[in-house]
Design a protein with these regions (language model features):
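Active-site rim elements
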Residues: 139-150, 297-305, 377-385, 443-454, ...
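Short glycine/proline-rich turn/loop motifs
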Residues: 24-27, 71-73, 133-141, 287-300, ...
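Conserved flavin/dinucleotide-binding core of flavoenzymes
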Residues: 15, 26-29, 34, 42, ...
Length: 559
């Protein structure tokens, strides 16, 4: 059957939309006369079976969601790639498709860089800290690096699709998680409050204030009375206002006693007073709705099943022969013929030469490597800062946040040094689980990161127990990561200002003779895996254009 389909496809050069004709022809050739209904059923089965087989045999051309089509061959050219993270491996992955010989030097004993999921037997040793080895139960993990894929990061999703990495929904926004304001004053301070309560109360009070102001013509807006009334009606609906435009309790913010069977109608909780919300600090920047309104954090979001570093691991499997692990670069030198790099592996000094180098090493690390780059590039490397950030994974013997508090995924926000608690978006209803006990930034990350590994755990448990008193009884194991103290990273992601985008950033977009730069720090997608993927493609296009003397700009297609 596949042979017959192949002949038909090759003769008529049909594509997927013409498979009904193929089904008709082949069915007539090999099947006895059948009814229309039976024919349609069997045609569908035929198409479903034949199409994947024809794709595998190269009889039909697939239609990639984010194609990257470059012409010409890189045969005979050697590209050296520094860094085995997503940007480095993606560069090698695309270049090898074009025939280039690639070599990746990775300083760590693993690939992925900051795309790292901590699971059983994962290890790290930070600067001035003891070695940690994760003792999580088999199958449990947390993403120490990137943990979310926005739905509009189509290139990231494209590579998940192309590489066969399954994804699942990541629950970034959960109204059932908590706000916790430590300090402040009044009845809402030092008390966990469901996010939905604060959101609905603040929305209701602000809608009430604006509706009253419009009614009393205290708002300077150029609109007719009819339009003003439409705005007021919108505010009534949006804020849950009554007929008098007053915010009263509604089911939106939850129940004291939930509805049930028979006479159990449920008891609606009274709204918190606006003054109490303010005095507790629950309208401070720590509790702004950034997680909902920021473009990159809007639902739907995804994560790779089994850990985000499965993306990196799948790339590694395709590139095993070109990756050298434990190779710490000490020198990068542009030469007349190409580039020469010195590195240390197994306590031995080694040297490698190539036609072109793609450097994906994070800038704080690159700043400590000898090189002969231009002054502009050197300044960019030395002066672009990276964010200080850290996480801790806490394993509990029972998923009490689900069982006791009905929190399934999402984030609890605090104003203390925990900053955020992330609940896992996988293995719902399982017995055990690992949540991220803190995810902090800047000064808070520096403060917590300076603690010993044991004291980080103690801090996370003590502060976390203020929100979840089940912590002490249910806790089992922990593993913490401070990226600004992690060798070969020295920070979470690059931070640019408007001014540095015009100077330092521009310098890194151009090759320094035979050295090209890639990584999230060479995009406007810093902190995201999409930045690594986009930068890799841009750099591959630039390198290939140079090697084949073509004019190529990225993106190369409209997809």
């Amino acid at each position: 059957l596949i042979f017959i389909c192949g002949i038909v496809v090759q003769v008529f050069q049909f594509h997927q939309e013409n498979l009904t004709f193929i089904a008709l022809l082949t069915t007539r050739l090999i099947l006895p006369p059948v009814s229309r209904r039976s024919f349609l059923k069997k045609s569908g089965l035929l198409v479903g079976a034949a199409y994947p087989a024809m794709l595998a045999l190269g009889m039909l051309k697939s239609s990639p969601a984010h194609s990257f089509e470059l012409n010409g061959s890189g045969e005979g050219k050697h590209i050296l790639i520094l860094g085995g993270g997503l940007a480095g491996m993606t560069s090698a992955y695309e270049l090898t498709k074009l025939g280039y010989r690639c070599t990746i030097l990775e300083a760590r004993q693993r690939t992925g860089g900051r795309c790292w999921s901590v699971r059983k037997n994962s290890t790290t040793q930070e600067i001035d800290h003891s070695v940690q080895t994760a003792q999580f139960d088999e199958g449990l993990y947390f993403n120490a690096g990137p943990s979310r894929i926005p739905h509009h990061h189509q290139l990231t999703l494209h590579y998940c699709r192309e590489l066969g990495v399954p994804v699942e929904i990541y629950n970034n926004v959960n109204e059932g998680a908590y706000f916790f304001s430590e300090g402040g004053s009044g009845p809402l301070s030092n008390k966990k409050i469901r996010i939905r309560e604060i959101h609905n109360d603040v929305r209701g009070y602000t809608s009430e204030l604006l509706a009253k102001a419009i009614d009393q013509e205290h708002v300077d807006m150029a609109m007719s009375k009819e339009d003003a009334q439409k705005v007021v009606e919108y505010l009534r609906a949006e804020g849950g206002l009554d007929i008098d435009k007053l915010y009263k309790a509604s089911a939106r913010r939850g129940y004291i006693d939930a509805p049930g069977a028979g006479e159990k109608a449920g008891t609606i909780a009274d709204p918190h007073k606006l003054a109490d919300i303010l005095h507790a600090g629950l309208m401070s920047p720590d509790f702004y709705n950034v997680a909902e309104y920021t473009y990159e954090l809007q639902m739907t979001m995804f994560q790779a099943k089994g850990g985000m570093d499965n993306i990196a691991k799948t790339l590694e499997k395709k590139l095993e022969k070109v990756i050298t692990l434990g190779a710490e670069v000490s020198s990068i030198e542009n030469t007349e013929k190409g580039v020469k790099v010195k590195y240390k592996q197994n306590q031995q000094e080694k040297m490698i030469e190539a036609d072109v180098c793609i450097c994906t090493i994070p800038l704080p690390v690159l700043s400590n490597i000898h090189h002969n780059f231009s002054d502009d590039v050197s300044r960019a490397i030395d002066f672009v800062p990276y964010i200080n950030t850290g996480k801790i994974g806490l394993q509990f013997k029972r998923r009490f946040w689900e069982e006791d508090e009905h929190v399934f995924g999402g984030i609890t926000h605090t104003n203390n040094d925990l900053t955020q608690i992330f609940y896992p978006s996988y293995d719902y209803l399982a017995k055990k689980g690992v949540l991220i006990g803190y995810y902090n930034f800047n000064d808070k990350a520096v403060k917590v990161g300076s603690l010993s590994n044991a004291d980080r755990e103690k801090f996370a448990l003590e502060k976390g127990a203020m929100i979840h008193p089940q912590y002490p009884k249910e806790f089992e194991k922990s593993f913490s990561v401070s990226w600004h103290l992690t060798p070969h990273s020295l920070g979470g992601w690059a931070l640019y200002t408007g001014e540095s985008r015009k100077t330092s950033y521009k310098a890194l977009l151009q090759p320094d003779k035979n050295v090209y730069f890639a990584g999230e720090h060479t995009t406007y997608l810093t902190a995201w895996m999409a930045g690594a993927f986009e930068s890799a493609r841009r750099t591959v296009a630039d390198v290939h254009a140079r090697m084949t003397e073509q004019r190529i700009s990225y993106p190369t297609t409209k997809n």
